[in-house]
């Protein structure tokens, strides 16, 4: 709860998007645009509705998930420290985060992230401990299970929420993230007493995902069920979404005129692009964005 409701990532986002940092805010686990129901509603808007975020819009000032409490997690922090102290945890907790040793950019990003932890949590609660690996995150970090957390992501392989949500379930050898990132699948084999509530939450989440995945004759009901499962995952912070990765370029092509498929090979086709002899400006792109948003809203 402290992670999801307390960390202000704005300065960290600015490392990716200096002009509009909060355009990088990610409050959901499934990427936008993967699928739509028969009413034309994009799937993550269903998750937003389940979480009470459906009325919240980008304002360029405050992260959506920090608006309800203004980022104030003092009560949650106090509760967490009391509960963790009761099982022998000492503070500050060290959150170990690995970056590749050869990248100065990765170090700069991690340094900003460390400051976000400090500003949001206070140095008496959780401190980011930046560590490095030489060449292989898998061999040097994931396999020996040295990480406290990993910031990672991927694009859709196919157009259905199970593509994402199935990665975090229990009792499934194909749940890649459960087995190789959070390692929760291994915890499930022999949980300690203090992990009971966490495992109960993962079991409930797994049941919700499996129930949604069993709905194969009603697309709208399937997506509604997955949205409830995803909202449960996020409200219980079984994972904490961080940011949308974007690429910067000085371009003579209007990105809003390109094919924007969420999966498959279509994006590699250079057809029907709108182009300009002069590189587009920020002002022009703001106009493109407004026109695009108006078009998709009908």
Set out the residue ranges of the language-model regions.
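Periplasmic-binding protein-like
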Residues: 1-48, 59, 64-72, 109, ...
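Ligand/substrate-recognition segments at binding pockets and active sites
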Residues: 56-156, 247, 298
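Solvent-exposed loop/turn segments at secondary-structure junctions
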Residues: 9-12, 19-23, 34-37, 101-105, ...
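Hydrophobic alpha-helix feature that most strongly marks membrane-spanning transmembrane helices
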Residues: 17, 118-122, 142, 155, ...
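Short, solvent-exposed loop/beta-turn-alpha elements that line the ligand-binding surface or hinge
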Residues: 35-71, 85-89, 139-145, 166-209, ...
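Bilobed periplasmic-binding protein-like "clamshell/Venus-flytrap" ligand-binding domains
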Residues: 13-17, 74-101, 197-253
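Soluble non-cytosolic domains of exported or imported proteins
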Residues: 6, 64-71, 103-111, 196-203, ...
């Amino acid at each position: 709860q402290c992670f999801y409701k307390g960390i202000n990532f704005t300065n960290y986002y600015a490392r990716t998007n200096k002009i509009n940092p909060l355009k990088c805010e990610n409050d959901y686990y499934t990427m936008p645009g993967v699928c739509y129901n028969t009413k034309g509603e994009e799937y993550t808007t269903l998750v937003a509705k389940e979480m009470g975020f459906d009325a919240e819009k980008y304002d360029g000032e405050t992260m959506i998930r920090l608006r309800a409490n203004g980022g104030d997690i003092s009560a949650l922090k106090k509760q967490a420290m009391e509960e963790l102290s009761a099982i022998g945890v000492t503070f500050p907790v060290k959150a170990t985060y690995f970056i590749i040793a050869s990248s100065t950019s990765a170090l700069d990003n991690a340094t900003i992230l460390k400051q976000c932890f400090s500003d949001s949590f206070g140095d008496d609660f959780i401190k980011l401990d930046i560590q490095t690996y030489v060449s292989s995150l898998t061999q040097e970090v994931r396999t020996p299970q040295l990480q406290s957390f990993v910031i990672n992501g991927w694009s859709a392989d196919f157009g259905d929420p199970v593509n994402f949500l199935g990665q975090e379930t229990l009792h499934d050898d194909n749940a890649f993230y459960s087995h190789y990132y959070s390692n929760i699948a291994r915890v499930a084999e022999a949980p300690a007493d203090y992990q009971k509530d966490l495992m109960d939450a993962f079991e409930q989440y797994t049941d919700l995902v499996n129930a949604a995945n069993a709905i194969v004759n009603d697309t709208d009901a399937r997506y509604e069920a997955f949205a409830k499962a995803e909202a449960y995952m996020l409200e219980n912070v079984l994972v904490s979404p961080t940011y949308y990765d974007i690429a910067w370029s000085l371009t003579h092509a209007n990105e809003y005129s390109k094919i924007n498929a969420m999966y498959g090979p279509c994006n590699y086709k250079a057809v029907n692009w709108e182009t300009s002899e002069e590189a587009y400006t920020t002002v022009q792109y703001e106009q493109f964005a407004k026109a695009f948003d108006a078009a998709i809203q009908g």
